[in-house]
Amino acid sequence: MEKWRFDSMLFSGVLEYRCGLSKSINSLGDPIENTSVNEDPIINDMDKDIPSGSDSDNSSYSNVDHLVGVRYIRNFLSDDTFLVRDSNRDSYTIYFDIENQIFEIDNHDSFISEPENSFYSYQNSSYLNNVSKNDDPRYDRYVYDTQYSWNNHINSCIGSYLRYQICIDSDILTSSDNYNDNYIYTYICGERVNSNESESSNIRTGADDSDLTTIRESSNDLDVTQKYRHLWVQCENCYGLNYKRFLKSKMNICEHCGCHLKMSSSDRIELLIDPGTWDPMDEDMVSLDPIEFNSEEEPYKDRIDSYQRKTGLTEAVQTGTGKLNGIPVAIGVMDFQFMGGSMGSVVGEKITRLIEYATNQSLPLILVCASGGARMQEGSLSLMQMAKISSALYDYQSNKKLFYIAILTSPTTGGVTASFGMLGDIIIAEPNAYIAFAGKRVIEQTLNKTVPEGSQVAEYLFHKGLFDPIVPRNPLKGVLSELFQLHAFFPLNQNSIK
């Protein structure tokens, strides 16, 4: 049977509240034991049978019940005093304070001032003289040999507690009872003893200087995380880490939960358009700060320049023509990374020109929406883009009878939702996309009403008839190709169909 040992606590799958030191101060194999389940443990079982060192090797060090799950450890880890008793019924007070790194042991009967005396008498006991230390699988030389001082041992105890406190927000505190022993050991124990294996393979010390070195090294984990954070993308849904190099090949879909993460406009163009067929339009069109918007934090022009350097784009939308499985299409893709995909005068003008070009060339149109709405730095000029784009779409759809598909990604809000985002002949949404006109916080502050959770998510809105299908990214290109062919748009070369 495997025994988890950590000074004043024993671990065997779940945390056991009723224990003091892992080994008795006065006799081998007899743990100082706390037999109470209250917040302030007291001694209430004077006849508790505790296995001695003469028991078989398969016996457990602990003869206690599983009283408190690991998730309740926060209740007694910070600053507590335990009243415990060894097999000789000698009472001890064990006090520890994590914040101040205090660990004290007092004997209630004889008021021993130096705990080292107890260890000295223990090491010279008759048991140690009669029984071979190396033959006893429960003998831990790192704790009881004289060259390892009591101070180092206590420092190890406090260090392990502190290391646990740092990791206390991990999954170990969830409501699940299916705890993995190794997982608990990793975060709490710092050392392990297995009574069925030899000493050379089963004893791991936490009492020497290497444990303190490990603690110091762990303090640099945050710096290491910051150094390599650019290599990983964290999922917004499950908070799992996805390796950035592989994420693009997986269409920016989380490998842990399948959540559709945000994609750049360039990645979406690469996903939908056949290689070598992309022809961009109006790439040199940039905003000139038409209303001379003043900001205390950063001038509008400087902010535009910073996003241009950051994304490599000139504005929050890319427009152009290309082929989708051999079918010529006009496509505009908004990029949320550029000022939240906000729609200003340049964005509206580029989309309007794209629609007019598709009208003249009789091309099917795709607009991929990812926007926070109208750009406030351009005032009413940004608001008028809603009407301008809608007017161009009216001519495209009603007069020319051409086919327009709107793809709503996360997030699609504000003026984009109120204009061309909802004007498609077919409106497609990505799974779990956030789609709304006004955000949850704006609605709650304006109407003083609570917005239900999930009421602005694609799956909920689908049942309300807000759009047509919800299509994941994997089959999206094939779905678009079938829709175009259904509406009499065919590839120029039949052999180019993939």
From Swiss-Prot:
Sequence segments annotated as region (Disordered): 36-59
Location of the protein in the cell: Plastid, Chloroplast stroma
Annotated metabolic or biological route of this protein: Lipid metabolism; malonyl-CoA biosynthesis; malonyl-CoA from acetyl-CoA: step 1/1
Cofactor(s) annotated in UniProt: Zn(2+)
Keyword Manganese: no
Ranges where the CoA carboxyltransferase N-terminal domain occurs: 231-498
One GO MF term attached to the UniProt entry: zinc ion binding
UniProt keyword Lipid metabolism present: yes
Record-listed Zn(2+) binding positions: C235, C238, C254, C257
Enzyme class: transferase
Record field: catalytic activity: N(6)-carboxybiotinyl-L-lysyl-[protein] + acetyl-CoA = N(6)-biotinyl-L-lysyl-[protein] + malonyl-CoA
Top-level taxon of origin: Eukaryota
Cofactor binding: number and manner: Binds 1 zinc ion per subunit.
Keywords linked to the UniProt accession: ATP-binding, Chloroplast, Fatty acid biosynthesis, Fatty acid metabolism, Lipid biosynthesis, Lipid metabolism, Metal-binding, Nucleotide-binding, Plastid, Transferase, Zinc, Zinc-finger
InterPro entries, alphabetized: AcCoA_carboxyl_beta (IPR034733), Acetyl_CoA_COase_Trfase_b_su (IPR000438), ClpP/crotonase-like_dom_sf (IPR029045), COA_CT_N (IPR011762)
Zinc finger feature spans (C4-type): 235-257
Major place of residence: plastid
The EC number(s) this enzyme carries: 2.1.3.15
Gene Ontology biological process terms, A to Z: fatty acid biosynthetic process; malonyl-CoA biosynthetic process
A GO CC annotation given for this chain: acetyl-CoA carboxylase complex
Function: Component of the acetyl coenzyme A carboxylase (ACC) complex. Biotin carboxylase (BC) catalyzes the carboxylation of biotin on its carrier protein (BCCP) and then the CO(2) group is transferred by the transcarboxylase to acetyl-CoA to form malonyl-CoA.
Family label: Belongs to the AccD/PCCB family.
Subunit structure: Acetyl-CoA carboxylase is a heterohexamer composed of biotin carboxyl carrier protein, biotin carboxylase and 2 subunits each of ACCase subunit alpha and ACCase plastid-coded subunit beta (accD).
PANTHER family on file: ACETYL-COENZYME A CARBOXYLASE CARBOXYL TRANSFERASE SUBUNIT BETA, CHLOROPLASTIC
Official protein name in the record: Acetyl-coenzyme A carboxylase carboxyl transferase subunit beta, chloroplastic
Gene encoding the protein: accD
